[in-house]
Amino acid sequence: MPEPTWIGAEIATKKAVPDGLWTQCPECAETVFRKSLEANLMVCPKCDHHMRISARRRIDQLLDPGTFEALDADMAPMDPLGFVDQKPYIERIRDTQRKTKEQDGVQTGTGFIKGRKVVVGVMDFTFMAGSMGSVVGEKLTRAIEHATDHNLPLVIVCCSGGARMQESGFSLMQMAKTSAALARFDSAGGLYIAVLADPTTGGVTASYAMLGDVIFAEPKALIGFAGPRVIQQTIRQELPEGFQTAEFLEKAGFVDRIVHRSALRTEISRIIDYSGK
């Protein structure tokens, strides 16, 4: 019996639909048209879940169009320890660079937010979970020093799994280096606004993420040092529900305000105006 013509037409139609038109929300499982999601700043229109985004997309959302000028754009990581886990660290770097088209896990530069010039540092979770190695720490330190030298407000968007284990002590020393640079920036009267996105953990939380004069967080962002299972096994006590969420930390005074992604530009510009910078 010959196949009905409509079946062949339906199959042809399905094959003609390109990949990537739809995205499933990881929070509510709603399927959302990709262009609609991008127009909504990668926030789910159904449950308001703030999805993780690349540093480039964050810069496009945060800064005035066409104003971003990168600092130290060509700085790339090395492998001084010759570290090997499942594969050599240098291969892991190169694979991630090919996949992301980025040199490392942070973008730094200058730009304008509603007409106010700022220095920005934006971490990129798509590059090895936004982990902080020597390049991330050095680029952020130089950005902080640029803000100090030019008396500009500083905005750092944190989104990281913490220190990069493949760099061992070279990674851990970035906590002290960035914190020292921020102390000098503070002594010079600088304004530092930290924005904590999901997730902000480990050595990043233990250093520059929590040193802002003003600390904003995106809704429901995971913020903490160690994971809840590690903490529970260490202290052997039941932990409060949601104790590592932005909402819990706001109530405890560790976060100044939870800011929706759509309002972030406005809130940052208000703080800059209020500070007189």
Residue ranges of model-derived segments:
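N-terminal alpha-helical interaction blocks
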Residues: M1-T13
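N-terminal targeting/trafficking signals and adjacent low-complexity tails
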Residues: K15-P18
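Residues immediately within or flanking Cys/His clusters that coordinate Zn2+
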Residues: W22, L41
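Short cysteine-rich clusters marking metal-coordination/redox-active sites
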Residues: C25-C28, C44-C47
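Cys/His-rich microdomains that often coordinate metals
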Residues: T31-V32, H50-M51
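Long, charge-rich boundary regions
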Residues: R52-M128
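Cleft-lining beta-strand/loop regions that shape enzyme active-site pockets
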Residues: D104-D186, I193
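Conserved catalytic cores of soluble enzyme domains
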Residues: C158-G276
